[in-house]
């Protein structure tokens, strides 16, 4: 056995390789290169098409299946959606400036999303998609990039509060 002194883990431990964060850069307010405009347009069209199909065929469901044009919930109960897709898409709705769709998603989270569900949720998926989605939406609504939705301190606090509610469970 190796003898480890009682105070071995006290204080800061130096890293073996010095690590420096890169300097902060502002988010570009316009495409960096001319071909970026075409790519940005293609991304917007693809997202709007996918999001529109989800809203039409599976609104509120956790997952959307485009081939069958149907949705499912991860708990396999229609009455217990957690809204994985809605919350996961919030940051994209904000960045693309899709205000009406953003409002629909925000209102669904306000009116329908409940943590009081019976069943077992995947901790990884819940953390990255729901908790991550709420936290990124909170940060983006506090200080959105230029050309996206207008900042909303109220919405930022709302999403942060919902994230805290989930994290406390």
Which residues are covered by each model-predicted region?
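Glycan-recognition and catalytic cores of secretory/periplasmic carbohydrate-active enzymes
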Residues: 1-169
């Amino acid at each position: 056995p190796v003898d480890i002194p009682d105070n071995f883990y006290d204080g800061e431990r130096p890293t073996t390789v010095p690590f420096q964060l890169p300097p902060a850069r502002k988010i570009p307010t316009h495409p960096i290169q001319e071909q970026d405009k075409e790519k940005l347009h293609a991304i917007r069209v693809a997202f709007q098409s996918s999001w529109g199909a989800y809203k039409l065929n599976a609104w509120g469901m956790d997952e959307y299946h485009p081939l069958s044009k149907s949705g499912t919930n991860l708990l396999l109960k229609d009455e217990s959606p957690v809204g994985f897709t809605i919350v996961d898409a919030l940051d994209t709705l904000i960045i693309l400036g899709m205000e009406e769709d953003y409002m629909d998603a925000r209102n669904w989270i306000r009116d329908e999303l409940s943590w009081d569900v019976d069943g077992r949720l995947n901790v990884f998926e819940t953390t990255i998609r729901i908790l991550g989605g709420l936290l990124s939406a909170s940060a983006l609504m506090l200080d959105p990039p230029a050309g996206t939705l207008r900042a909303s301190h109220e919405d930022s606090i709302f999403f942060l509060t919902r994230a805290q509610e989930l994290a406390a469970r």
